[in-house]
């Protein structure tokens, strides 16, 4: 396994638990967010013998990284936290060179709930853009707040908070229930971080959680036997 997080603390948060579960971490690297040539890093990955590359890309250019990984036909599939790869047009934007990348996301056109696909399609129809994860949360939050106010029969802050704490709402991405710290609960049927893979024709297949899986993992085309 090779790991390329841009932040030192993130590097340790990935490397330590990976080792704890028995993963063989071959190397970890940091790089400047302005990096335009990833070939030296990709060469290290290739020579490391790693079977999978985990990335954490936020401020760096995901487009450039994916293109160079693809063009070099690096024999190591990759995925992780890649903010720009969460964009619905990422695959088409870089000419399909994101094929097989697995990226964490919340907003994927998949039957996460009965609301997901209708919302996704209506959003695209009305805005000409694909929704990102913030769109899911913003949409749901309006309805959650409105229902809490209705139950409270008031806009009084304390009364509304008490009703918000009772929330059990089927959202676009999963059921929304708050815990005692007012965080959204995760778990089967609830809101979850989804890992989805870019596949042929720009389709995204959900690989995790298992109960939401819509496809199977594929290798980059040049690694297929």
Over which residues does each language-model region extend?
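Extracellular/periplasmic Venus flytrap/periplasmic-binding protein
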Residues: 1-73, 109-118
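Cofactor-binding loop segments of dinucleotide-utilizing enzymes, especially the Rossmann-like FAD-
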Residues: 1-3, 81-83, 200
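Extracytoplasmic ligand-binding site segments that recognize negatively charged/polar headgroups
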Residues: 2-13, 88-89, 136-142
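Structured segments of extracytoplasmic/periplasmic soluble domains
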Residues: 13-21, 44, 48, 56, ...
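Conserved beta-strand scaffold positions in the cores of enzyme catalytic domains, especially
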Residues: 25-30, 101-103, 195
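Extracellular/periplasmic periplasmic-binding protein-like sensory domains
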Residues: 69-139, 150-153, 209-225
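Segments of small-molecule ligand-sensing domains
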Residues: 125-135, 146-207
């Amino acid at each position: 396994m090779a790991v390329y997080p841009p932040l030192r603390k993130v590097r340790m948060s990935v490397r330590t638990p990976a080792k704890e579960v028995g993963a063989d971490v071959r190397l970890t690297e940091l790089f400047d967010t302005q990096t335009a040539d990833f070939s030296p890093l990709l060469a290290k990955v290739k020579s490391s013998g790693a079977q999978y590359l985990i990335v954490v890309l936020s401020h760096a250019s995901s487009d450039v990284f994916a293109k160079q990984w693809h063009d070099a036909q690096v024999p190591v599939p990759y995925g992780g936290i890649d903010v720009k790869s969460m964009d619905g047009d990422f695959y088409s934007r870089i000419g399909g060179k994101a094929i097989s990348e697995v990226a964490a996301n919340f907003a994927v056109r998949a039957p996460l709930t009965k609301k997901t696909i209708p919302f996704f399609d209506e959003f695209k129809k009305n805005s000409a853009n694909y929704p990102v994860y913030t769109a899911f949360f913003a949409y749901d939050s309006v309805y959650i707040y409105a229902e809490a106010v209705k139950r409270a029969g008031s806009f009084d802050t304390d009364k509304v908070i008490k009703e918000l704490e009772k929330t059990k709402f089927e959202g676009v991405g999963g059921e929304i229930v708050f815990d005692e710290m007012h965080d959204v609960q995760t778990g089967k049927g609830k809101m979850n971080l989804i890992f989805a893979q870019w596949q042929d024709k720009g389709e995204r297949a959900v690989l995790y959680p298992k109960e939401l899986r819509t496809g199977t993992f594929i290798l980059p085309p040049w690694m297929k036997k």
